[in-house]
């Protein structure tokens, strides 16, 4: 079936790196199409890279263009509930995302990962280990390189990180293995509630051969009503069943069906959440027919991703930890649960809270020798959580205030539990700024 047979006009909604990748892909593979781009921002990112012959409308919607479209490719940041998108859907016109276009074009096996937390680390490590096992692999999607740009590479396997937003507009993605890591409250400004959010995540199993789910979080299991009879489930968790953790030779080991694989202490990654992440990677590789034992040396030397519990400065016995990727409550909870701090912890929280309830942090914070530093648009929401809470406007103000007090054994940690869009372009920019300040004051 030629999916493009009746499509003559395509409107791409939202520019940026994803929108540009869509335009490049369409020009290369479907040069006969008329492609137009709408971005409601007055000066969208990437506008200078758009080919001059592509029609562009900025600053508002262009209903006339949408009314003429045979296909609309929307950015994951734009909700399907947006009235202009609903009008398109009511006309019976397909609204897809870049991942759906990737699914139409990909001709090699695909592994995909979703979940509220840990998906970037799992995606990256799966790719690193697959390559170490001799399987040429490309990593992308919601992490780093847009999925469509991966099609330019000569590879044997694709590994994609997928957000719930991307899954909403994806219906044809066939996967050799799919993982749903965990579910915790996030994006409640976009979804009707937790079940709505969960249903978006569960779409990852729609055309998957193997599903990797979390024994410690039953919400990750697909419902039988989804009709995925052919889906083979593989589980991971903190006990010793399937992919899990067992006691061996007097210490904790990662295991498969109660057979030891690797001692937990051999991992460079810190925290219990990262042990779970590694188990998922081992499960995904197994599902894809890759012998993970060939990649264990790569696993042992893997230090994790930038902006994820990353030590950016360590001077005079004071550690500065950049966990800017912690854009929700559960990420910050995970970072704190695996923490080893000899002195006082100076914890920086705040930003764009996305309508979340942060009160579950209170019992964890109560156990720590802590100075809670609250900044950004929703910093006030953290003030009732600890007696030490102090309010600041910007991250720079926090560092300037605390730096004279720091002593050997202390830790300064940015794990904001919030999105960055109130003061930064993204979590990377926020983390980079923190790293700059750390180097300046360390």
UniProtKB/Swiss-Prot annotation:
Keywords, ordered alphabetically: ATP-binding, Cell cycle, Cell division, Cell shape, Cell wall biogenesis/degradation, Cytoplasm, Ligase, Nucleotide-binding, Peptidoglycan synthesis
Main subcellular location: cytoplasm
Range of residues in the leader sequence: none
GO cellular component: cytoplasm
EC identifiers of the protein: 6.3.2.9
GO molecular function, one term: ATP binding
Intracellular or extracellular location(s): Cytoplasm
Pathway: Cell wall biogenesis; peptidoglycan biosynthesis
Record-listed ATP binding positions: 115-121
Coiled coil regions, renumbered to chain: none
Catalytic activity: UDP-N-acetyl-alpha-D-muramoyl-L-alanine + D-glutamate + ATP = UDP-N-acetyl-alpha-D-muramoyl-L-alanyl-D-glutamate + ADP + phosphate + H(+)
Gene3D superfamilies (UniProt xref): Mur ligase, C-terminal domain, Mur-like, catalytic domain, NAD(P)-binding Rossmann-like Domain
Domain of life according to the entry: Bacteria
GO biological process: cell division; cell wall organization; peptidoglycan biosynthetic process; regulation of cell shape
Family: Belongs to the MurCDEF family.
Known function: Cell wall formation. Catalyzes the addition of glutamate to the nucleotide precursor UDP-N-acetylmuramoyl-L-alanine (UMA).
This protein's name: UDP-N-acetylmuramoylalanine--D-glutamate ligase
Species whose genome carries this gene: Vibrio vulnificus (strain YJ016)
Lineage per the UniProt record: Bacteria, Pseudomonadati, Pseudomonadota, Gammaproteobacteria, Vibrionales
